[in-house]
Regions:
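Short sequence/structural segments immediately N-terminal
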Residues: 25-27
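Stable alpha-helical elements in mature extracytoplasmic
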Residues: 21, 58, 62, 89-90
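Sec-dependent N-terminal signal peptides
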Residues: 4-13
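The canonical Cys-X-X-Cys-His
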Residues: 29-36, 93
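Intrinsically disordered, low-complexity linker/tail regions enriched in Pro/Ser/Thr
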Residues: 3-4, 19-20
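Sec/Tat signal peptide C-region and signal peptidase I cleavage site
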Residues: 14-18
Length: 101
């Protein structure tokens, strides 16, 4: 019985991190300022993917930017820090953003 309970708990926690990236972006309020195809307040995810294409440090840079915020890269409006986004969630989001073509 303990084995079944442990397996169920593991599956539930794993599915939380396997959450669809677009839903995660919505849940974390990323889509308040960003869209996939066009600039809103912040850049479109396709613009971000194009800018960082071929940059081997993109994942590290952008995970940090998602969590800590930043300014000056895409214009005068700063991106606020997002402390409610875990490092794992930020990595899922950034991987998805960088996959936009």
């Amino acid at each position: 019985m303990k084995t079944i309970l442990a397996a169920a708990l593991f599956a539930a926690s794993a599915s939380a991190f396997a959450q669809e990236p677009a839903k995660l972006a919505q849940d974390k309020a990323c889509l308040t300022c960003h869209t996939v195809d066009r600039k809103l307040v912040g850049p479109a995810y396709k613009e971000v993917a194009a800018k960082y294409a071929g940059d081997k440090e993109a994942m590290t840079k952008l995970v940090k930017k998602v969590r800590d915020g930043g300014q000056g890269v895409w214009g005068p409006v700063p991106m606020p820090p997002n402390p409610s986004v875990s490092e794992k969630e930020a990595a899922v989001l950034v991987k998805w953003i960088l996959s936009q073509k």
